[in-house]
Every structure is written in C-alpha cells, then in structure tokens.
Amino acid sequence: MLPFSLDTVRLFLHVTAAAVWVGGQLTLLGLLPVLRGLSPEAPKLAARRFNTLAWSAFVVLFVTGIWNLLAESPGSMGTAWNVTLGLKLLMVAATGIAAAFHAGATSKAVLAAGGAISLVAGLAAVALGIMLASAPT
C-alpha cells in the first residue's frame, strides 16, 4: 500500500472542497425547477443553506491552493505550466467574485449572470487544475 502523507491530506482537502463548491452549484442548478415548484421561497432557502457550506469550501480551496503552490514550486515548472496556473487562478477569482455577486443579487439579471459565470469559471478552474496535476514534471 502507498504511504499516507501530508500530500494526501492536502490533495484530499483540495479535491473535496472543489467537489463541494462546483458540485454543489451543479446540484442546485439541477434542483432549481423542483425547488421552484415547492414554493417561491424554497430556492432562496436552499441557496442560503448552501452558501454556508459553499463559502467554507471556497476558503478550504484557497488555503489548500496556496499549500499546493508551496508544494509544487511553480518557479521550477515550465512556461506552459505557469500560464495554465495563471489561467486557473483567474478562473478561481472569477468564480468567487461571480458567486459573491450572485449571493448578494437584488435583480434577476445579476442573480442569473452571477450564478452562470461562477459555475462556468468553477468548471474551468477544475479542468485547468486537472491539467496542472497531470502535466509531466
């Protein structure tokens, strides 16, 4: 059996938090029609409850992302790896900022745009993260 290490903990926390952040958004998107059918307040109640979990996951992503950078030493990676990292960091910022706008939205347009941008940027960050993790070192 492979050894259990701090790298295992770091990656477990990072991947689990990403699953909560992005997977939760996908789940709420899928449940939205059902929630709307239950009552006009049901989507808001579900979103408020998810917010606590989601933002906690985002903090874990941020902290473990920094931990990942310290473990990988980007300075020793090639240009393509660092460009991919830069794009991932932009997507992480975009998903967080868009989610904040979504959470504080007072109009349907901002609510929809914030949710859509947050989800797409989150999915892009996951894809870019997989590219970084699977790149030859």
Predicted feature residues:
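Polytopic transmembrane helical bundles with strong interfacial aromatic enrichment
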Residues: M1-T137
